[in-house]
């Protein structure tokens, strides 16, 4: 499961964990800022890496990213279902629009990212 954990008003962690609530508790230990689990969505390790690629220009340290307007709007406006076997339409569109831009620059060698794009691509008619 993909999780988004906010630290204050400036940073967000994009990560992958089978148990995001447990991961939040682990990260909170020793952290002076109050962390908040903003949302989760169904996804794989490859989905996490695709999101990291998309927001690479805002990367701070590790899996922490500067909370830009774009990322904040994505977190506020997107409806990402938490139920099993439900495809999140918003994340499909997000990945389709974002990854194609970065694929030519950062991920040409990655078969996993290419497969992810094929998996989430949506034909519009």
What are these regions (language model features)?
Residues 1-125:
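Non-catalytic accessory segments flanking enzymatic or RNA/DNA-binding domains
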């Amino acid at each position: 499961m993909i999780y988004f954990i906010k630290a204050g008003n400036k940073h967000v962690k994009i990560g992958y964990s089978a148990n995001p609530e447990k991961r939040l508790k682990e990260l909170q230990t020793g952290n002076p800022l109050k962390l908040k689990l903003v949302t989760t969505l169904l996804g794989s390790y490859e989905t996490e890496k695709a999101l990291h690629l998309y927001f690479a220009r805002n990367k701070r340290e590790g899996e922490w990213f500067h909370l830009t307007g774009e990322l904040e709007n994505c977190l506020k406006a997107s409806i990402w279902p938490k139920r099993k076997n439900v495809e999140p339409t918003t994340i499909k569109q997000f990945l389709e629009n974002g990854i194609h831009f970065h694929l030519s620059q950062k991920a040409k060698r990655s078969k996993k990212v290419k497969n992810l794009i094929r998996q989430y691509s949506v034909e519009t008619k």
